[in-house]
């Protein structure tokens, strides 16, 4: 099976606090993987390293590959980082869309990496590109909102627009950081259904950070759980049982309660 993401000996320190400890991880083509863990476990930090949004410590032997290209090595970004980013879609908790633009215009932003520079200066997109953007919006159930401003949409609708933008980008990997954290249950279900549909029917690899274990169990075949910057569990979601859940979350809560009591 083709390895899409490879992480070796990744460490990260913030202000003398070590957020990640020599993490090793391989993610294969077509997987939908949940990164789980309590707040401060390192899951979002790990996700942001995968495409070089942040760099790791200058540890000997640390290395990250994405789509067969080096992203960073020993704390330094690769010179051709844009080539791997060009096929990587991002979905963030805070949506990361341009509120003053329409839904369609936001989706067309996904085509910038494959559009000649002179056309991007004038926001000129071809008829074929606009048609593809509308198809992407149809895919996520948002085509009827194409000409509305993004600022008029709900949080769940904005996340679906972000997914459509990744489709427009022709992403081979989608990295989603807490995409349902601020959504109501119905909106969260629709967003996760959309990600799973893209994963299963398009073969796009999806890595998603989640707080909600029930969503990870329902939508992802594989769970990678982090605890205090270490990989605590990496395996089939169906084997992530109550004992592992208790050790991952409740032991952390007890430490926090004891600290408050002191």
From Swiss-Prot:
SMART domains for this protein: AAA
Source domain of life: Bacteria
GO cellular component: plasma membrane
Keyword terms, alphabetized: ATP-binding, Cell inner membrane, Cell membrane, Membrane, Nucleotide-binding, Phosphonate transport, Translocase, Transport
SUPFAM superfamilies in the record: P-loop containing nucleoside triphosphate hydrolases
Statement: the UniProt record of this protein carries the keyword Metal-binding: no
Family: Belongs to the ABC transporter superfamily. Phosphonates importer (TC 3.A.1.9.1) family.
Major localization listed first in the record, in broad terms: membrane
Catalysed reactions, semicolon-separated: phosphonate(out) + ATP + H2O = phosphonate(in) + ADP + phosphate + H(+)
Taxonomic source organism: Escherichia coli (strain UTI89 / UPEC)
Assembly information from the UniProt record: The complex is composed of two ATP-binding proteins (PhnC), two transmembrane proteins (PhnE) and a solute-binding protein (PhnD).
InterPro entries: AAA+_ATPase, ABC_transporter-like_ATP-bd, ABC_transporter-like_CS, ABC_transpr_PhnC, MetN_ABC_transporter-like, P-loop_NTPase
Gene Ontology MF: a single term: ATP binding
Protein name: Phosphonates import ATP-binding protein PhnC
PANTHER family assigned to the protein according to its UniProt record, in alphabetical order: AMINO ACID IMPORT ATP-BINDING PROTEIN, PHOSPHONATES IMPORT ATP-BINDING PROTEIN PHNC
Subcellular location: Cell inner membrane
EC number of this enzyme: 7.3.2.2
Known role: Part of the ABC transporter complex PhnCDE involved in phosphonates import. Responsible for energy coupling to the transport system.
Database matches in NCBIfam families: ABC_phnC, PRK09984.1
Binding site for ATP: 37-44
UniProt membrane topology term: Peripheral membrane protein
Domain named ABC transporter: residues: 5-253
